[in-house]
């Protein structure tokens, strides 16, 4: 079992959310259907590895588009609590069943929605959300999913403002 590690030392981590703008442009350009992004950022940075956070968001956006209805709406928001930067990615897609929500971050797991979408050209091995989970854990954060089948899926990421490795810098 390989453990995921961040590429950079904790002191070097500060991710500006410009990465979100780049990703939304990229996905709008390559999507096979209309995609509308609603961006609402109360906080502009996260204590995270820029490259890896970009990969996490890319993964979540890609899934939102893959497993969506004809017209895709994705909202990305950020806020800060006392201890965390909270990042949310929500879509108006096909949703994920309660049973699948319990296992969705496990390696090689694919939601029933994903299996059904294979007929529509969605591909992959079920590694994406496991990777997302590993990255967030490597940043001492947490990720949760909330979804209603046929309506929406929302991923909420909590990234600590302070970790044991960066306390002395604040």
Task: Name each model-derived stretch.
Residues 91:
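Acidic ATP/Mg2+-coordinating residue in the GHKL
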Residues 96-109:
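Short conserved segment of the HATPase_c
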Residues 128, 132:
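Short alpha-helical Gxxx[C/S/T] motif in the catalytic ATP-binding
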């Amino acid at each position: 079992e390989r453990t995921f590690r961040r590429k950079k030392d904790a002191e070097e981590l500060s991710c500006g959310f410009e990465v979100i703008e780049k990703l939304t442009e990229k996905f709008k350009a390559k999507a096979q259907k209309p995609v509308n992004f609603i961006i609402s950022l109360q906080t502009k940075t996260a204590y995270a590895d820029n490259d890896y956070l970009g990969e996490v968001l890319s993964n979540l956006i890609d899934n939102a588009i893959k497993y969506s209805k004809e017209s895709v709406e994705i909202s990305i928001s950020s806020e800060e609590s006392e201890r965390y930067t909270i990042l949310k990615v929500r879509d108006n897609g096909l949703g994920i069943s309660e049973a699948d929500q319990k296992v969705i971050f496990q390696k090689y797991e694919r939601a029933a929605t994903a299996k059904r979408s294979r007929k529509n050209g969605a591909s992959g091995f079920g590694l994406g959300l496991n990777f997302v989970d590993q990255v967030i854990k490597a940043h001492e954060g947490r990720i949760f999913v909330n979804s209603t089948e046929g309506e929406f899926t929302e991923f909420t990421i909590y990234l600590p403002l302070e970790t044991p490795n960066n306390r002395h810098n604040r």
